[in-house]
């Protein structure tokens, strides 16, 4: 609900516009971007518009809230708006050897947790989905992930829900258990889905 935006001009300084109350959560990156904090009485969209200046074309991320975009449009009336993915999508898909190695490592760590599930090292029967989810999360961290982004465990009829939230349902013998989990390891994400 509060605007946080990275403004990347064609030339010049990159700026992270962030609510003042969130500044402590932003890791400073000197030489990469500066931080402009906005207070409760300031209009963050006006700050972004000022940073954009006379930009002729503005690429906007797909996750930008419509309310902020609608406020921004009249503040930069001569600009053309495009989807950021159309501009940087190809760049994001291109990986050097170190990035590929980081992706492989993150995937391999998740694969090891999946193997632990299949081999029974993470017990299922008689335990709740939430307990198994917690075990998967702990194993991802033990395998080198910095953060667990999700650990969905869905037993029986719950497996029909693609983004089920693990709960108090107890897993019974001879039923399908869908496990969808992943996290971030050295800045790169893993994501794996398996049925046990």
How should these model regions be labeled?
Residues 1, 85-89, 126-196:
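Short catalytic-site patches enriched in acidic/histidine residues
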Residues 1-112:
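A composition/biophysics-driven feature that prefers long, compositionally simple stretches
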Residues 51, 71-76, 120, 135, ...:
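Alpha-helical structural signal in soluble globular domains
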Residues 61, 118-127:
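Conserved short loop/turn motifs at secondary-structure junctions
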Residues 107-118, 129, 136-137:
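Active-site pocket-lining segments that scaffold enzyme catalytic pockets across diverse folds
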